[in-house]
Swiss-Prot record:
Residues 49-401 are annotated as: Disordered. This is Translation initiation factor IF-2. Residues 540-543 are annotated as: G3. Its main location: cytoplasm. It holds the Pfam family EF-G_D2. One of its GO terms (molecular function) is GTPase activity. Residues 378-391 have a biased composition (Basic residues). It comes from the Bacteria. The gene is infB. The keyword S-adenosyl-L-methionine does not apply. Residues 125-136 have a biased composition (Polar residues). Residues 49-58, 65-89, 99-113, 349-377 have a biased composition (Basic and acidic residues).
Length: 985
């Protein structure tokens, strides 16, 4: 016996190969793949596992025959209906192949022989009784008693199990030849006189090779064999005493040429002929003594409503014989004789036959059989064997449940065409019909897309837009079993020059302060220290007032805040700010009282000042840990580290290293050789080289990672600070880093954020409306100080921008037209030339080309290393833009003692300088009785007919006032001038 392979057995059991392999493993049978061969006992075990027994070949053949010939009741009825009354579907093998003397098809011989024995067992004891009943019944009488005019009724002396009953005394020239009494080599097996085991029953004394057996005293060339005393050429054989040319044989004493034969004593005009003593208007005519309204007429003394009527004393086991569903046993009453002539119904018009059907109905002598042309027109395609086979093989198309097409609020024509499964040209044509001229890349709204889909009968629904940014930023739920302890993140905060970086240097045993400009920290640094086998991550923040955002950012990413306070200086403004940041972030605070080595150190003063800000140390009954240290002498450091580890242990800081990384950008810069570089603190998950990340408005792939000691690493677990390379641009400090799996998703989120920030910048920019235009013209032009800032790191730019924007006043505004990380380049100089801006470089230098271009364009480049100097110089520049204040300075007074009138000059006042001096170009006021009569300019000043620039106190002078001649004796003329005073911010 051939061994079965795994895939063959899986196919037989209708399961997947993988499922079968797993099942074999469970029962102790080892297989390597789906091509492995299985022993018989292994196959038996599998059958036992799935509750299936191994079938024998005879049973399989029997079941196959039962499936082919519709042994079930419901399948039998349906098949018989299709064969009798739906000719287009009756094209199976052995049904209506009318080619004369066609040799038998040997493909069915083996199948019939194998099926003979189980078929005999199925009919068993019923055979003897049926055979005796059929032998005692007269031939013609049996046809009449079983109801004449029935399609495919039994024939006398019939064998059991035949679809059309037995045919005695068969004729010649049948499509499949005669059946002898043994009848070997027939496509459906032998027909013995008992007819057991044949799928279509036996033929008594029959001809060989006929698909439907012999007809008694039959005519030649009939596709369904002879009928007793019947006419020739009928598709279903003769009926006793019947007329010719009827598609279902003769009816007793019936009329000729009716499409479905005569009915005895029947009414005319019925589509399928008359029925004996029947009611009219039935779709298939009357049945003798039958009930009305049955789909296939009455049966004599039979059960009503049966599809194929009764069989007289019929043999059991026949597809249409007695003992089948819908049939009665016993003979019915004789049918009354129908009238000799009945009006012939109008023939039904049918479409022309195909070439293959016409050829099958053409006889050897080149002539058509009697009545064959008309009947072939009625039953087009009945004999098409290939079509029947195709009909059996082709399954009906599955009914698809049409789901609504999801369409976004805005969709391009090309995408809409793809969703509707149409071409873009068809969709554009529909749009033009709606009056919309669109190209394939043009977008249409949801309503228009719905109208187009409705034209094709497709329903639509609005697709809910997925917020990709929310999807990326969503924090997944953590599995408690996967959380492990992580190092604490400690931020060192405090006032400037209180020793924060020196304390961190002492812990790290390095010297960072030596390399800092001005001795102050101006950007965040992240470092990792290992002490007693446990790691601690330190984040150093600036203490200067300009770096508020850095301190706030440091507090947000930290687990523990170390507040450094100088023992000799106490709590200062930035110390208070750091306390507020730590409280806002809900971070535990450890106070490090530094500079204990100084002689004037006073730790109690520090503790007392801390209580004013709700920080009560443990020594005073509070819960705040205070540790005195000296960064210079390196004392108290071990105690400080122990306190850090203690607080971290109490808070049980945990993270999941097996998930996608998430962290915060501590600092970012543009390196000339490496490109954008970001210092990132990984807070959760593990960041690996090659991960796709999105950082604020920037996305990219991690090309390399460098730890705080300058070593390249391949992965960064939680609480690890690393520098990453591979970003598309310099991110902003404080941005959240998220590792994602889809690179396209990262790009989309970054681009969306960039667009949103640009729109926010446009909205926030101050604009002068038409309503305010006249007001601004009257008040004077708004003065702006355009500035271009270039710095070494992103954090410094952030600090500078915030510090400079605070300098803005109502009269002068600081306009940061461009900020960037990296050296000053030619683009910055060209932008400064166009906008008349000043260039500020913080810890960067201009390259040679930029310096040459700046000299040519006369652009001033200001370079700084300390943030104090930047703020002071910008203040001076802004002060120069302010309008000066004017102050009135009184020069002197002149008493008018005599007036003279000159025709060409006007009134000349002669006076005496009583106080100060009087200057020729000075402004004057004419005061009369303490009231200012006129204020204007001095026109001329003379002494003894000579022009004088000024006249001092105690001297006389003559003067004229511009556009004023009403000077009287006794008036006081006050000389004054307006002096401009420079304003400062």
């Amino acid at each position: 016996m051939t061994k079965k392979r795994v895939h063959e057995l899986a196919k037989e059991l209708n399961i997947e190969n993988k499922e079968l392999i797993n099942k074999l493993m469970q029962i102790g049978i080892s297989v390597k793949s789906h091509m492995s061969a299985l022993e018989n006992d292994a196959v038996e075990k599998v059958y036992h596992q799935y509750g299936k027994k191994q079938e024998k070949s005879s049973d399989s053949a029997n079941k196959q025959i039962q499936r082919e010939h519709g042994r079930g009741q419901g399948m039998e009825d349906k098949k018989e209906k299709d064969q009798l009354f739906r000719p287009d579907n009756a094209k199976g093998p052995g049904l209506v192949d009318r080619v004369p003397n066609r040799p038998p098809d040997r493909r069915y011989e083996d199948k019939a022989k194998v099926a003979q024995k189980p078929a005999q067992e199925l009919r068993g004891s019923k055979t003897t009784t049926n055979s005796e009943n059929e032998q005692t019944a007269p031939r013609q009488g049996s046809a009449q008693q079983s109801g004449q005019g029935r399609p495919q009724a039994n024939r006398p002396q019939g064998s059991q199990g035949r679809p059309y009953g037995g045919r005695p005394q068969g004729g010649q020239s049948r499509p499949y030849g005669d059946r002898p009494q043994g009848g070997q080599g027939r496509p459906y097996g032998d027909r013995p006189q008992g007819g057991q085991g044949r799928p279509y029953g036996d033929r008594p004394q029959g001809g060989q090779g006929r698909p439907y057996g012999d007809r008694p005293q039959g005519g030649q060339g009939r596709p369904y064999g002879d009928r007793p005393q019947g006419g020739q050429g009928r598709p279903y054989g003769d009926r006793p005493q019947g007329g010719q040319g009827r598609p279902y044989g003769d009816r007793p004493q019936g009329g000729q040429s009716r499409p479905y034969g005569d009915r005895p004593q029947g009414g005319q005009g019925r589509p399928y002929g008359d029925r004996p003593q029947g009611g009219q208007s039935r779709p298939y005519g009357d049945r003798p003594q039958g009930g009305q309204g049955r789909p296939y007429g009455d049966r004599p003394q039979g059960g009503q409503g049966r599809h194929y009527g009764d069989r007289p004393q019929g043999g059991q086991g026949r597809p249409q014989g007695a003992g089948r569903p819908g049939a009665n046993r016993g003979a019915g009453p004789s049918i009354p004789k129908p009238p000799e002539q009945v009006a012939q119904p109008k023939p039904t018009k049918a479409p022309d036959k195909t070439k293959g059907d016409r050829r099958k109905n053409y006889e050897k002598d080149g002539k058509w059989a009697d009545g064959q042309i008309e009947k072939n027109k009625l039953f087009k395609g009945r004999n098409n064997k290939n079509k029947k086979r195709q009909h059996q093989q082709s399954a009906p198309p599955p009914i698809l449940d049409k789901k609504p097409v999801q369409i976004a609020e805005v969709i391009t024509v090309q995408e809409l065409a793809e969703k509707l499964k149409k071409t873009a040209a068809e969709v554009i044509k529909k749009l033009m019909g709606l009056g919309v001229l669109a190209t394939i890349n043009q977008e249409v709204d949801f309503e228009t897309a719905t109208l187009i889909a409705g034209e094709y009968g497709i329903e639509t629904e609005l697709k809910v837009a997925v917020d990709k940014e929310a999807l990326v930023m969503a924090e997944p739920e953590e599995d408690e079993d996967k959380l492990v302890l992580r190092p604490p993140v400690v931020t060192i905060m405090g006032h400037v020059d209180h020793g924060k970086t020196s304390l961190l240097d002492a812990i790290r045993e390095t010297n960072v302060t030596a390399g800092e400009a001005g001795g102050i920290t101006q950007h965040i640094g992240a470092y990792q220290v290992e002490r007693n086998g446990k790691k601690i991550t330190f984040v150093d923040t600036p203490g200067h007032a300009a770096f508020t955002s850095m301190r706030a950012r440091g507090a947000q990413i930290t687990d523990i805040a170390i507040l450094v306070v100088a023992a000799d200086d106490g709590v200062m403004p930035q110390t208070i700010e750091a306390i507020n940041h730590a409280k806002a972030a809900n971070v535990p605070i450890i106070v490090a009282i530094n500079k204990m080595d100084k002689p004037d150190a006073n730790p109690d003063k520090v503790k007392q000042e801390l209580t004013q800000h709700e920080l009560v140390v443990e020594d005073w009954g509070g819960d705040v840990i205070a540790v005195p240290v000296s960064a210079k002498n390196r004392t108290g450091l071990d105690n400080l580290l122990e306190m850090i580890l203690l607080v971290a242990e109490v808070h049980e800081l945990k993270a999941n290293p097996d998930r996608m990384a998430r962290g915060t950008v501590v600092e970012a810069e543009l390196d000339k050789g490496r490109g954008p570089v970001a210092t990132v603190l990984v807070q959760n998950g593990t960041l690996n080289v090659g991960d796709t990340i999105v950082v604020g408005q920037v996305s990219g792939r991690v090309r390399a990672m460098i730890d705080d000691k300058g070593r390249r690493v391949k992965k960064a677990p939680p609480s690890t600070p690393v520098e990453i390379l591979g970003l598309s641009d310099v991110p902003e400090a404080g941005d959240i880093l998220v590792a994602v799996e889809d690179e396209k998703l990262a790009r989309d989120v970054a681009e969306k954020r960039k667009i949103r920030k640009r729109e926010e910048g446009l909205k926030s920019s101050t604009k002068i409306s038409l309503d305010d235009l006249f007001k601004h013209i009257q008040e004077g032009q708004i003065k702006e100080l355009p500035i271009i800032v270039k710095a070494d790191v992103q954090g410094s730019i952030e600090a500078l921008a915030q510090a400079l924007e605070k300098l803005t006043t109502e009269e002068v505004k600081v306009n940061l037209i461009h900020t960037g990380v990296g050296a000053v380049n030619e683009t910055d100089i060209m932008l400064a030339t166009a906008s008349n801006a000043i260039v500020i470089g913080f810890n960067v230098r201009p390259d040679n080309n930029a310096r040459k271009l700046a000299d040519a364009e006369k652009v001033d480049i200001n370079l700084y290393r300390v943030i104090y100097e930047v703020i002071d110089d910008v203040k001076k520049a802004m002060s120069g833009l302010l309008d000066p204040e004017f102050k009135e300075v009184v020069l002197g007074h002149v008493e008018v003692r005599k007036t003279f009138k000159a025709s060409k000059i006007g009134t000349i006042a002669g006076g005496y300088v009583t106080e100060g001096k009087i200057v020729r170009d000075a402004s004057v006021r004419v005061i009369r009785d303490g009231i200012v009569v006129f204020e204007g300019k001095l026109d001329s000043l003379k002494r003894f007919k000579d022009d004088a620039k000024e006249v001092a106190q105690g001297y006389e002078c003559g003067l004229t006032i511009d556009r004023f001649n009403d000077v009287q004796e006794g008036d006081i003329i006050e000389a004054f001038t307006m002096e401009a005073i420079k304003r400062e911010i």
